[in-house]
Amino acid sequence: YADGLNIPTGMEVGHGVVYVGQGTELLELRDRDGDGVADERKILLSGFGNGDSHQTINSFVWSPDGELWFCQGDGIQSRVETPHGISSLYQAGVYRLRPGNLRLDGLLDDFMGPGNPWGVAFDDFGQSLVADGAGGISYLTPASIPAKRRLRLPRIGQPGGYCGIECIGAANLPKEMQGEFIVGDYKRNRVSRLAISEDGAGFK
């Protein structure tokens, strides 16, 4: 479909295009003639950090309300020029993009949450969790509004090294698994299930 990419670490399909994160850029690839090869390659946004090539923007996923969310790992500092001004994210965090107007919000700036996020998932009610390659799972929804006061998000469940997270909602899987999360646990070389329960205003 597309060649000549430079260490792409994130990809998602939507609106008739493929969004790709590579190095400092967010690309939009489009196949105009339906031959399975991208005819157009457009840089939507640039200025994402590349201080560590395996922690650049990654893990693209659509939210239930049509926003594109993706992560940025430790050792990365981004200053992205958008039509709405500069969007900055210092160190590890999560981005929320509205593709229609290119509004980009940086969330969890400067270690408010996971130290190396690799994956965001939403449950049936739109609640979001983020997987951390350096520590565990965090409840992300409280950080959905960019904050000036930095508070660290609490962890959910056991610490681990996670890469990728998804909420189970497939009819071909057992009923008792529906609504649970699956995570890739690279430190233990396995895929794990995570069942969460309410804990005050958050989850455990």
Language-model-detected regions and their locations in the chain:
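Beta-propeller blade termini and top-face loops
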Residues: 1-204
